[in-house]
């Protein structure tokens, strides 16, 4: 059995080249963040930027900010919550929640067919940060990357129906919603026009984890 040693650590400016490589490998072109946005996230809230390192290579990255979160009135979109990824205008040090701005894993971080838990490890580190900073919860706008292909194969279905579709094991049909539900997140709100994302037909789903 192969044992993989994945380390999660805070990122710094020296990691920017490696971070941008992960971004290129992890996301469709319309969903990628620019180098300037990652630089800004490192400057505004460095405690919220983590990288996953495997075999001395950065293979995953996650970024976050602090916001004032009202579960009865959550952000309408990722774009609104993050100022389109430029968090200097949305980060609120006095807020009550950690908002995950991004989480991406390169195929280099998935050497096994089912992966080795790089994304889960990055998400767990953001959970730990929420606890360390005594925030109430961890929230994010999840993509629904299976939605477009599902509609193309089975005919157009309302997004409300798609996010509620379950597999035989009871978990969501959508791979990303499934990932977050396994991690203990609950769906809060469907967000249309959350970001430019062809695979998700620009939809996102606000999900929440109580710290």
Regions found by a protein language model. Give the residues of each.
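A short beta-loop-alpha structural element at the N-terminal edge
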Residues: 5-18
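Anionic, Ser/Thr-rich low-complexity intrinsically disordered regions
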Residues: 20, 26-34, 40-51, 63, ...
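Conserved acyl-donor/pantetheine-binding loop and adjacent beta-alpha core of acyl/acetyltransferases
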Residues: 62-114, 124, 144-173, 181, ...
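Conserved acetyl-CoA-binding loop-helix of GNAT-fold acetyltransferases
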Residues: 111-130, 140
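Glycine-rich phosphate/pyrophosphate-binding loop shared by adenosine-nucleotide-utilizing enzymes
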Residues: 4-6, 57-61, 98
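Short acidic/polar active-site loop segments enriched in Thr and Asp
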Residues: 136, 186
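Active-site rim helix/loop that mediates acceptor-substrate recognition in acyltransferases
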Residues: 28-89
């Amino acid at each position: 059995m192969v044992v993989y040693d994945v380390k999660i650590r805070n990122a710094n400016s020296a990691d920017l080249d490696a971070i941008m490589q992960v971004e290129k490998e992890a996301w469709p072109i319309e969903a990628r963040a620019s180098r300037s946005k990652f630089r800004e996230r490192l400057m505004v809230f460095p405690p919220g930027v983590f990288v996953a390192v495997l075999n001395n290579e950065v293979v995953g990255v996650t970024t976050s900010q602090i916001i004032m979160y009202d579960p009865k009135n959550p952000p309408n979109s990722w774009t609104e919550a993050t100022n389109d990824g430029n968090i200097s205008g949305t980060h609120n040090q006095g807020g009550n929640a950690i908002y995950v701005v991004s989480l991406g894993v390169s195929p280099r971080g998935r050497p096994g067919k089912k992966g080795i838990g790089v994304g889960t490890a990055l998400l767990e580190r953001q959970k730990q940060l929420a606890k360390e900073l005594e925030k109430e919860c961890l929230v994010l706008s999840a993509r629904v990357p299976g939605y477009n292909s599902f509609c193309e194969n089975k005919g157009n279905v309302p997004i409300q129906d798609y996010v509620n579709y379950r597999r035989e094991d009871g978990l969501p049909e959508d791979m990303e919603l499934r990932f977050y539900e396994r991690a203990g997140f609950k769906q809060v709100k469907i967000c249309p026009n959350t970001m430019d994302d062809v695979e998700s037909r620009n939809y996102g789903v606000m999900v929440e984890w109580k710290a």
